[in-house]
């Protein structure tokens, strides 16, 4: 792998994102589509840009992403995690500020499985006293 390209893997819920960052003009491409076209929701686009805005590299890096699995929120979170890891590979001095913002830690929350005898993961059937 060339020294000009930086890689980070991000995960969130059931989504996995492979992020490649290189010096450029600030283009973000997700699954061969521009960020604004891929994510319809403004909140998802904002989540993806958070680590770049924090370290003020929005216009300095081109980001190329391949993301699989999950929904909009999970994919946006996975991309954010991947971008954070790629930034740390680029410059280890960015780690403390990214850690303070909470971008380095992988969000371990996943959907809890449904249990036998219950309606959902924790919702019990209605109880009738008589």
UniProtKB/Swiss-Prot annotation:
Q: Which UniProt keywords apply?
A: Ribonucleoprotein, Ribosomal protein
What cellular-component terms does GO give this entry?
cytosolic small ribosomal subunit
Q: Which SUPFAM superfamilies match?
A: Ribosomal protein S5 domain 2-like
Any one GO MF annotation of this record? RNA binding
Q: Does the keyword Protease apply?
A: no
Provide a GO biological process annotation. Answer: translation
Write down the PANTHER family for this protein, in alphabetical order: RIBOSOMAL PROTEIN S9, SMALL RIBOSOMAL SUBUNIT PROTEIN US9M
Q: Which family does it belong to?
A: Belongs to the universal ribosomal protein uS9 family.
State what protein this is by name.
Answer: Small ribosomal subunit protein uS9
